[in-house]
């Protein structure tokens, strides 16, 4: 565990490549922990705390061709007023959920509804990470997909199990991001060529 973690899970992207990645979600869902797993130990001091609005900070870093930000969705208006420019500029949006906290599900659904309503995720791939799948009371992936109504999305999406404590699911999420980001960028480039 320590050897892999110290190097960081994110692979280095080819020269000239850049993937913009946003990690959002409710409090205590694992956003900062995931960010710290992604990067190597020596890069943690390079994480910047950026003030984006009065009293609202995001964590930001560029690492091996990945431009990452992570932030809490504390209030519904954060999406439309504060995070929208960051979300619209992202290739990938990871929405973190504590799958062991049933009370968080309703608020998570409200936030995802708002993301769809505000058209914040139309041009990105969208990944819901059901963290804390190691807990006995966790919600299953199928239950989560149905409750959040993820089938409404027209862009590439996936709901994956994750246990950051056990470091299970991180490699699967990175693999899915890489596969779907390449497909999405190719599709967007083809659309631009036709216009």
From Swiss-Prot:
It comes from Dictyostelium discoideum (Social amoeba). The keyword NADP does not apply. GTP binds at residues 25-32, 72-76, 131-134. GO terms for biological process: intracellular protein transport; protein localization to Golgi membrane; vesicle-mediated transport. Signal peptide: none annotated. The keyword Metal-binding does not apply. This is ADP-ribosylation factor L. Belongs to the small GTPase superfamily. Arf family.
């Amino acid at each position: 565990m320590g050897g892999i973690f110290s190097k960081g899970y994110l692979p280095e992207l080819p020269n000239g490549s850049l993937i913009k990645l946003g990690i959002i979600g409710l409090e205590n869902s694992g956003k900062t922990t995931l960010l710290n797993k992604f990067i190597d130990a020596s890069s943690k001091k390079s994480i910047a705390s950026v003030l984006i609005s009065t009293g609202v900070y995001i964590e930001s870093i560029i690492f091996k061709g990945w431009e990452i930000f992570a932030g809490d969705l504390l209030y519904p208006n954060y999406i439309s007023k504060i995070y929208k420019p960051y979300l619209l500029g992202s290739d990938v949006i990871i929405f973190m959920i504590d799958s062991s906290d049933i009370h968080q599900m309703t608020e998570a659904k409200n936030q995802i509804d708002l993301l769809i309503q505000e058209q914040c995720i139309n041009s990105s791939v969208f990944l819901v990470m059901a963290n804390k799948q190691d807990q006995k009371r966790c919600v299953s992936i199928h239950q989560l997909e149905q409750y959040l109504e993820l089938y409404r999305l027209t862009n590439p999406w996936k709901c994956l199990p994750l246990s950051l404590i056990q470091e299970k699911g991180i490699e699967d999420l990175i693999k899915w991001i890489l596969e779907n980001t390449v497909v999405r960028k190719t599709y967007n480039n083809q659309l631009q060529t036709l216009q």
